[in-house]
Amino acid sequence: MAETDARVNFDLPATLRKWPSLNNERLKEGRSAYLVFEGTLDECIKEYKTKPESSRHLYEIHTAPQPPLVTETLLGEHIVELARLRDFL
């Protein structure tokens, strides 16, 4: 599939999760990301964008993969790029 043929369904279910942190640093040992918001991919992207930029590295979005543009777990810059794509469409 050519990149120009790629489509993203922003209406698919998704969850926004946040990693526990201390002093804005992710705690890794024995911890997992917890649910912050549940909705569509579009709603989770919007919710992510409301978070302070200084703490966005602690968040991730989980959704059904949509190759080649959407992976099961979306992080930082990937979320921002999808938001730009959504705004472009």
Residues of each region from the PLM?
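Short loop-to-beta-strand transition segments
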Residues: 56-62
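A short, exposed loop/beta-hairpin motif centered on an aromatic-Gly-Thr core
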Residues: 31-39
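Short secondary-structure boundary/capping segments within folded domains
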Residues: 7, 35, 49-53
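Short aromatic-glycine-(Arg/Gly/Cys) micro-motifs in beta-strand/loop hairpins
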Residues: 5-32
